[in-house]
From Swiss-Prot:
Role of this protein: Plays a role in the regulation of the mitochondrial ribosome assembly and of translational activity. Displays mitochondrial GTPase activity.
GO BP term (any one): regulation of respiratory system process
Residues that bind GTP: N82, K83, M84, D85, N152, V153, G154, K155, S156, S157, G204
Name listed for the protein in its UniProt record: Mitochondrial ribosome-associated GTPase 1
Family listed: Belongs to the TRAFAC class YlqF/YawG GTPase family. MTG1 subfamily.
A Pfam family: MMR_HSR1
Database matches in InterPro entries: G_CP_dom, GTP-bd, GTP-bd_ortho_bundle_sf, GTPase_MTG1, P-loop_NTPase
CP-type G domain sequence ranges: 35-208
Keywords: GTP-binding, Membrane, Mitochondrion, Mitochondrion inner membrane, Nucleotide-binding, Transit peptide, Translation regulation
Complexes and interactors: Associates with the mitochondrial ribosome large subunit; the association occurs in a GTP-dependent manner.
Signal peptide: none
Amino acid sequence: MRLWPQAWGAVRGAWRECFPLQGHDVARWFPGHMAKGLKKMQSSLKSVDCVIEVHDARIPFSGRNPLFQELLGLKPHLLVLNKMDLADLTEQQKIVQRLEEKGLSNVLFTNCVKDENIKQIVPKVMELIRCSYRYHRAETPEYCIMVVGVPNVGKSSLINSLRRQHLRTGKAARVGGEPGITRAVTSRIQVCERPLVFLLDTPGVLAPRIESVETGLKLALCGTVLDHLVGEETMADYLLYTLNRHGLFGYVQHYALASACDQIEWVLKNVAIKLRKTRKVKVLTGTGNVNVIQPDYAMAARDFLRTFRSGLLGQVMLDRDIIPAC
């Protein structure tokens, strides 16, 4: 929920202009070697007619693996920005324009939960294939599409959504809220009868080197790595910083806080109190150990992240500062 800036005029000057990035080692957050997955994708390319790259619509410019275009660049390519229901797309046209400037002219926004825009995928893919040379597959009556992307952006959900739309059937690919559900290039999964289209689901593959700590934090907020590798409280702090800077104060209403605040300790303390999340801590006193009840900051941080990821804090564009001003 976006409130009028005047509502928080008294505290507006307190928002941080930058997030402290020193002391964070992004290399420790992400798996350092995913070449095995890329090699398996390459070995399957001969039987592939088109590549669908799935990415999170909340970070259209951040965290995409550049190796996808380098290794799979000879094939027609469609970028699907999924989870559009969670993203603030008021600047969608500018986002598409910037992506086009980067050479990505085929972009589609989707919501696999409600099958939004899913029906556009097969016609778009068929158009791309018709405009390209199929080499030794020219006489093959069926089409094979490879689905790639970083972890937990909805690749398997996209496959299941396509099957619902075109085959009226159930799940064929496992899905989950954590990265790493798909661990290998799967066998072909049929998603359409006419035309006859099969998809290959692939494991999420991150770039060998994350470009910056801030990009790493954005990827972490979108669930591309396990939270404990980055630290829930660090992620919650970056989320709070982002929400306040963008004037998104839905967290105030959701947790019934007295006001917006830029201090993560204060926010998590009040969230823990609201949720009745506490823990016992032993404190050494002059008369011995005493059990003291304290707010559970870790549990509060996890809930803060969960509500963001489920959309309860409103639609958010984490790449807002990268969108062209005009």
